[in-house]
Amino acid sequence: MARDEVRRILPADIKREVLIKDEKAETNPKWGFPPERRPMEMHMQFGIINLDKPPGPTSHEVVAWIKKLFNLSKAGHGGTLDPKVSGVLPVALERATRVVQALLPAGKEYVALMHLHGDIPEDKILAVMKEFQGEIIQRPPLRSAVKRRLRTRKVYYIEVLEIEGRDVLFRVGVEAGTYIRSLIHHIGLALGVGAHMAELRRTRSGPFKEDETLVTLHDLVDYYHFWKEDGIEEYFRKAIQPMEKAVEHLPKVWIRDSAVAAVTHGADLAVPGIVKLHKGIKKGDLVAIMTLKDELVALGKAMMTSGEMLQRSKGIAVDVDKVFMPRDWYPRMW
């Protein structure tokens, strides 16, 4: 049976059109700190690491180790990986810690090795695995920390990479909270022979991939020492991504300079503050509020659609939830 070409598309890959509300708006270069202009200490305070987690330690242990190494007060990870699982683990630092929430709607990708408990023809394996694309129902595994309620999760794609005897290597793109161990168990049941997960590696978490930004714990130790001991910051800077990377996939609203301080002081975003926005925003969507220099100001919930934000002259457009930008980056205008 011929293997179909698989389109590997996650929600994070959706391209969005930008709508302009005010063509004349400009930003003052004296204010703010765009990612490329942040001093090293600040870059770390508002940074996120695309870490290649090794098999062995828990995700929490890895984060605790990074906190201790860099002498941080806060850090958090996006999407727990079991101890035996390796791969992409975004670790957000200090002021950026809560940005990991933005990764939830982005989708994740894994490469898994499934071991079947009986011999099955290749064409049947391919046909049955294809059936698991789309909405599936899962109950978290017994060892999970989550309550074991039935819930639906989306499988965006399954691509079989190699079949050798009873071993099936495949790539799968899924919604956050999908248990690959459970998915493999159910594929085994559908094939009538049973199956278990032999190995698992996460290859993607939204915008974070197995690319040149992926760093190991050993890399981090070396780069940190180059910076602290030798004053060479180039490698450590590259190892830490700006927090804005974690919201690349989110629908965005860009605001004028005069609206920034109000949002950083706790105000919700009103329509007059908007300069441009992404098309397709729906009420209730998680949106990123950005400056015209592409600095992340805050995350919030859309209270209007894109069309309403574009057409209206007043009203609350975004209910601000988490503010990331310090209050002193832009001056108060009220």
From Swiss-Prot:
It holds the Pfam family TruB_C_2. It is an enzyme of class 5 (isomerase). Its EC number is 5.4.99.25. GO terms for molecular function: RNA binding; tRNA pseudouridine(55) synthase activity. Keywords: Isomerase, tRNA processing. The keyword Amino-acid biosynthesis does not apply. This is Probable tRNA pseudouridine synthase B. The gene is truB.
